[in-house]
Amino acid sequence: MTIKAILTDIEGAAGPASFLKDILLPYAREHLGAFIAAHAEDDGIEEALEEAGRLMGGFSLKPDEAEALLQRWMKQGRNPTPLKIIQGRIWQQGYEAGAFTAEIFPDVAPSLGAWKNAGIRLFTYSSSSELAQRLWLGSAGAEVFEGFFDTRVGQKLEEESYKAIAEQLALPAAEILVLSGNEDELDAAKAAGLATALIAREGGGGGNHPVAADFASVTIG
């Protein structure tokens, strides 16, 4: 069946996982307290902090309590929506201040452009917020993407999440190709009927999915 849409992960597939682990997350941890103190009443941030309180049983969080909670979530590797919203805004400030530059593999932008020109619809699916995804993909041309999915549609290891995405795209599952460096995520996508390709930038890869060394090596059926 002809591929009509590509759904790609970012971390490890379009950009190095080390950019998130070694640059973005430490920056968010370092600036979290000051950001909350300065922006707790801003549109979007106030609502995110209120939602964080609701997740903890409906408590109204003081700024230091909110910081402690979000720091704990980051240490635990959790990604609740309030945390993702605030991280995205902190990273936006970092990008704008020149604290870091988005890292994207060099094959990504040309491949995205070629797929777009071929009439293939492009989407992302990441644990990060839409803002964070747009910022990370900025150098590759985030405007080529029609949409940015995050965990509001479901967790990336769950088959139902991919079924929900296919439904939202109004496409047969088999016409959507999922690109990821995470085989467990691809297993969930495959179980939902989507086509898959493992982006194995450091080599390796099992036999459950077609393997490509980079975006330029992906075979579009």
UniProtKB/Swiss-Prot annotation:
GO molecular function per UniProt: 2,3-diketo-5-methylthiopentyl-1-phosphate enolase activity; 2-hydroxy-3-keto-5-methylthiopentenyl-1-phosphate phosphatase activity; acireductone synthase activity; magnesium ion binding
Protein keywords: Amino-acid biosynthesis, Hydrolase, Magnesium, Metal-binding, Methionine biosynthesis
Swiss-Prot/TrEMBL catalytic activity: 5-methylsulfanyl-2,3-dioxopentyl phosphate + H2O = 1,2-dihydroxy-5-(methylsulfanyl)pent-1-en-3-one + phosphate
Cofactor binding, per record: Binds 1 Mg(2+) ion per subunit.
Cofactor(s) the protein needs: Mg(2+)
InterPro entries: Enolase-ppase_E1, HAD-like_sf, HAD_sf
A GO BP annotation: L-methionine salvage from methylthioadenosine
Keyword Magnesium on entry: yes
Top-level taxon of origin: Bacteria
EC number(s) stated in the UniProt entry for this protein: 3.1.3.77
Pfam families per record: Hydrolase
Pathway the protein acts in: Amino-acid biosynthesis; L-methionine biosynthesis via salvage pathway; L-methionine from S-methyl-5-thio-alpha-D-ribose 1-phosphate: step 3/6; Amino-acid biosynthesis; L-methionine biosynthesis via salvage pathway; L-methionine from S-methyl-5-thio-alpha-D-ribose 1-phosphate: step 4/6
Quaternary data: Monomer.
Family: Belongs to the HAD-like hydrolase superfamily. MasA/MtnC family.
NCBIfam families, sorted: enolase-ppase (TIGR01691)
Function: Bifunctional enzyme that catalyzes the enolization of 2,3-diketo-5-methylthiopentyl-1-phosphate (DK-MTP-1-P) into the intermediate 2-hydroxy-3-keto-5-methylthiopentenyl-1-phosphate (HK-MTPenyl-1-P), which is then dephosphorylated to form the acireductone 1,2-dihydroxy-3-keto-5-methylthiopentene (DHK-MTPene).
Protein name listed in UniProt: Enolase-phosphatase E1
